[in-house]
A protein has these predicted regions:
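Short linear sequence signals and composition-biased patches located at protein termini or domain-edge surfaces
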Residues: 42-145
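Extracytoplasmic beta-strand-rich oligomerization domains located immediately C-terminal to a leader/signal peptide
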Residues: 1-50, 59, 140
């Protein structure tokens, strides 16, 4: 069978604000897919496999992206593990993705609070954009750490 590695990266958005001509304060999430050739991960640029690719943008206008490692007792692991041995203690990862609308949504400025997962890093906005938060839990048996 063929083994693939899927990687997600969060990078600064390249979208320019129409008024200021500066980059907007947001990020974009990119997805890459590599193939194991038996000894190394094959670079998508050198691969002949049509199923591999590099840095395909999957969502833009990302305002917040949080990954929280959880152990087998349901407790947040803080600080997050930095070694492979300690990463095996992670059983679930809670993922929060906060995105804003591309265009103005409200007629007038609205005061909004975006709540953070498990931290005191709530953000307040007072503008005309719609914001949504998506929260999922991923079990690490489905991921390679």
């Amino acid at each position: 069978y063929t083994t693939y590695k899927i990687t997600y990266e969060c990078k600064q958005s390249n979208i320019l604000d129409k008024k200021t001509k500066n980059k907007i304060s947001a990020f974009a999430i990119y997805k890459s897919k590599s193939k194991w050739d038996g000894s190394n991960w094959e670079s998508p640029t050198n691969s002949t496999d049509d199923l591999v690719y590099k840095d395909e943008m999957i969502v833009d206008y990302v305002q917040d992206f949080i990954l929280i490692p959880i152990d087998d007792k349901g407790k947040i692991i803080n600080p997050a593990p930095t070694t492979l041995a300690n990463s095996n203690k992670i059983k679930v990862i809670d993922i929060l993705l906060s995105v804003r609308s591309q265009n103005i949504f409200y007629k007038n400025n609205k005061s909004k609070t975006i709540y953070s997962l498990g931290k005191n890093a709530n953000k307040k906005f007072n503008d005309k954009f719609l914001r949504e938060q998506i929260v999922v839990s991923a079990h690490t048996r489905n991921m390679g750490l």
